[in-house]
């Protein structure tokens, strides 16, 4: 008698608990956007020698400025669309000691006119 209860209870418990993972994709998840949305158009406006104020006007406030490295700004954008894989885009902007733009790196290509005079 005790054995029959286990034969019924065990598959029932496994089926109910396993059903949670099968229904998870059906649960609605909101889209989550975090950080600085960076467009290639804005990156194309950056020029060698721009001041920090000019870069901030074009790109907006950086997501991160490390206290030990104030001449390196990080623009980070992270987007999660429901159950799909997350997307992350990074742009790192470097300034010299005078606060002028010297280099940039990340997921956005530098424009051909980056080294042209302002």
Swiss-Prot record:
Family the UniProt entry places it in: Belongs to the BamE family.
Any one annotated GO CC term: Bam protein complex
UniProt KW Membrane keyword: yes
Lipid attachment residues per UniProt (S-diacylglycerol cysteine): 20
Gene this chain is encoded by: bamE
Keyword Kinase: no
Keywords (A to Z) from UniProt: Cell outer membrane, Lipoprotein, Membrane, Palmitate, Signal
Membrane topology: Lipid-anchor
UniProt GO BP: Gram-negative-bacterium-type cell outer membrane assembly; protein insertion into membrane
Name assigned to this protein: Outer membrane protein assembly factor BamE
Range of residues in the leader sequence: 1-19
GO molecular function, one term: protein-macromolecule adaptor activity
